[in-house]
């Protein structure tokens, strides 16, 4: 495969390098470095965890084998009775002594060594590879990884991926292979064949989920990204329901709800094949959500799925929300009986402001993180700081996640509560102190710097806000306004705003950065590969973003002459570019009328 390097720009990320054509032929988004770094961190933790689980299984199997051999030997010894012949008796006893001492050890050692050879390096499937950068980084940066299979149904992408595999040398060519095929067909034809399946599509992953949950090996890792955030956050609820089987709500917690909708959808697909998922990490970053789940097979454990799903009732007036479980369980003798959930958990009208409720879901209401995994991933990232290009960002996200309440779905927004009452907002530290002093738990959220997770009921939350307003009076509002209705009631709980030591998390107390700004302008989604650039893209993204996306205009890669050549042919790069004019304002129209 002959390649004219003058037509390409070399992009280096981590230990991998890829050749990107100066035309928009193959999709690449620099902003996804956060996604790729987080995936590598989780993959490293998965390989370590997988090895630990295998060692534990071997140890258990070895002990079991030893006990079986000892039992057989003891039974054999009892069956053989001693004879009157002293020589024969001594000879027989001596033989049995050797067997009793050495037999179990040898059998256990043999079983251990035999099982040890069964653990092979994990096979990874990147279902939608595009340039192959992610697959190359997996192969070059993750120790102990096996074969990496990169798929794409676009010939230009597969050609680019194969070119990049060769460009990265022998290590990549020996581990990474690229195929032109439909990812869904490939996954369906390889059931339980991959230890890791990575889905990172352009848009919704819904059409790949059914085949993905079948392709993951038992105990394997499924990594899935969804970038259709407008759909998942309630802009088109009917579209979200058709894709994911859940109805979204427009709340301040909509991005976390998007995570939980995606998890519920994956669980639904897995249940059809007597499988279930265990989330280890769920992240909302930049313009997408990303979940990491392990997939297991168990018909009995699958029955617990309704206990992990809930409907959400959200008041249209004050944004109070309540969760109702889809199912419940009752212990019955030595078994468990599964029953429908009891509801509704709310009346027709909100008890706080008198407005109606919107109902959404079902969503995943069980924990979306495994705190042991999160701490392991975070420690691994800190120990390999130089190997993560986006170290600061992923470390900040993981730090915030490690301090979240794992068993509290969704969160409150302090500014939203204050906006409902039209009052000044208390500081986060004061509000958290009031919640803790009321004997409830509270934490932040990695999704929103203003988000507050707590197990306190909404009655306590509004009582705290009523007490705050009493000390910080506001102007009278319309009696029909939700805030006026809430404030018309006397608080049943007197809030204590004295500062509590737990009002600040450990990261906050140490002043560790938790929410970082974007590193550069236009840090977000990019134009789909091969799409014609129109005036709409220019107006939305700007000339700098569009041209930078197409040309991969990195000044450090070229000299001054190349920079001048890149500035000239804007007409060739952007088709249908409009003449730049200042849009008329209302003052202009008034002056011409």
Swiss-Prot record:
Q: Where is this region: Disordered?
A: 56-118, 546-593
EC class name: transferase
Q: Which family does it belong to?
A: Belongs to the class I-like SAM-binding methyltransferase superfamily. Trm1 family.
Q: Which InterPro entries match?
A: SAM-dependent_MTases_sf, Trm1, tRNA_met_Trm1_C
The annotated regions of Acidic residues compositional bias extend over: 558-577
What are the recorded Gene Ontology BP terms?
Answer: methylation; tRNA processing
Name the PANTHER family on file: N 2 ,N 2 -DIMETHYLGUANOSINE TRNA METHYLTRANSFERASE, TRNA (GUANINE(26)-N(2))-DIMETHYLTRANSFERASE 1
Where are stretches of biased composition, namely Basic and acidic residues? Answer: 68-81, 88-118, 578-587
User: What reactions does this protein catalyze?
Assistant: guanosine(26) in tRNA + 2 S-adenosyl-L-methionine = N(2)-dimethylguanosine(26) in tRNA + 2 S-adenosyl-L-homocysteine + 2 H(+)
**Taxonomy, superkingdom:** Eukaryota
Domain called Trm1 methyltransferase: residue spans: 9-465
Keyword Zinc listed? The answer is yes
Function in brief: Dimethylates a single guanine residue at position 26 of most tRNAs using S-adenosyl-L-methionine as donor of the methyl groups.
Among the GO molecular function terms of this UniProt record, one is: tRNA binding
- The residues that the entry says bind S-adenosyl-L-methionine are 36, 134, 152, 185
Task: List the keywords (alphabetical).
Answer: Metal-binding, Methyltransferase, RNA-binding, S-adenosyl-L-methionine, Transferase, tRNA processing, tRNA-binding, Zinc
Name used for this protein in its record: tRNA (guanine(26)-N(2))-dimethyltransferase 1
- In which residues is Zn(2+) bound? 315, 318, 350, 353
Known EC number: 2.1.1.216
